From Swiss-Prot:
Region of interest: Disordered: 212-275
Species per Swiss-Prot/TrEMBL record: Nitratiruptor sp. (strain SB155-2)
Oligomer status and interactors: Part of the 50S ribosomal subunit. Forms a bridge to the 30S subunit in the 70S ribosome.
Gene Ontology CC terms, in alphabetical order: large ribosomal subunit
Protein name: Large ribosomal subunit protein uL2
Upper taxonomic lineage: Bacteria, Pseudomonadati, Campylobacterota, Epsilonproteobacteria, Nautiliales
Pfam families xref list: Ribosomal_L2 (PF00181), Ribosomal_L2_C (PF03947)
Gene Ontology BP term (one): cytoplasmic translation
Keyword Methyltransferase: no
Biased composition (Basic residues): 257-275
GO molecular function annotations of the record: rRNA binding; structural constituent of ribosome; transferase activity
Record carries keyword RNA-binding: yes
Gene this chain is encoded by: rplB
Length: 275
């Protein structure tokens, strides 16, 4: 895949770029794997904004992805590589030998006609195969990693993401996560071998505000451009900065201030992420 650029026939097209979509082989064909999700637009069940700068965006259907990879011992063939509007990586439709069809995240190098399988142990270290962490060799790059056995993959699922198995300690496996954090995860958790595909996504340039509106992202207003009633940075004659450490609209320090609460799982973190 490559990044496609456009001729600057309008100002917004000058720097705009997209990822080449020649790897997509088909449109969605399995209706039972498509569902309509309600457009929350950043609102909670009371209709109040709990996540600012969000809107519905373009109309789209959610693809049900197999994050658990719990179909053990049944080989499956990759039938199609498809676009997913809800994520920045591609998805692969796998047709299993027993006729079952499931979507998985497409690892880099996985193509139509390839065979993938999930098992507790004993599989080849090939992109798309899934095993328990304790049975994957040290040094292997993995993605779609569970944090609790049977819950489904939660870590390293976006385009180009991966974690590396660094070692083992008792019932835990030591992973280096995409952020650089070193963390212990139970060896009973499942993970998929390989790097998530569509790595070039990180290099695209949105180019114009309209593309972000289609993605459901609304404009952000600076606090210093508001009135004092709306934001702690608001008001003043002319352009004035914050009188002290920058804060959120609710007075919480921001821009580098640590807000993460301590959790019992902190003991599993060997070293924090690199900034």
């Amino acid at each position: 895949m490559a990044v496609k650029k456009y001729k600057p026939y309008t100002p917004s097209r000058r720097f705009m770029s997209v990822v080449d979509s020649s790897d997509i082989t088909a449109k969605p064909s399995v209706r039972k794997l498509l569902v309509k999700l309600p457009a929350r637009a950043g609102r909670n069940n009371q209709g109040r904004i709990t996540s600012r700068h969000r809107e519905a965006g373009a109309k789209k259907l959610y693809r049900i992805i197999d994050f658990k990879r719990n179909k053990y011992g049944v080989p499956g063939r990759v039938a199609t590589i498809e676009y997913d509007p809800y994520r920045n990586c591609r998805i692969a439709l796998v047709v299993y030998r027993d006729g079952d069809k499931r979507y998985i995240i497409q690892p880099s190098g996985l193509k139509v006609g390839d065979t993938v399988e999930a098992a507790e142990a004993g599989l080849d270290v090939l992109p798309g195969n899934a095993m328990k962490l304790k049975n994957i060799p040290v040094g292997t790059l993995v993605h779609n990693i569970e944090m609790k056995p049977g819950k489904g993959g939660q870590l390293a699922r976006s385009a180009g993401a991966y974690a590396q198995i660094m070692g083992r300690e008792d019932k835990y496996v030591i992973l280096r996560l995409p952020s650089g954090e070193m963390r212990k995860i139970l060896g009973e958790c499942m993970a998929t071998i390989g790097v998530v595909g569509n790595e070039e996504y990180a290099n695209i340039v949105i180019g114009k505000a309209g593309r972000n509106r289609h993605r459901g992202i609304r404009p952000q207003t600076r606090g210093s451009a508001m009135n004092p009633v709306d934001h702690p940075h608001g008001g003043g004659e002319g352009k004035t900065g914050p009188s002290g450490h920058p804060v959120t609209p609710w007075g919480m320090p921001t821009k580098g201030y640590k807000t993460r609460r301590k959790k019992p799982s902190d003991k599993l973190i060997i070293s924090r992420r690199k900034k």
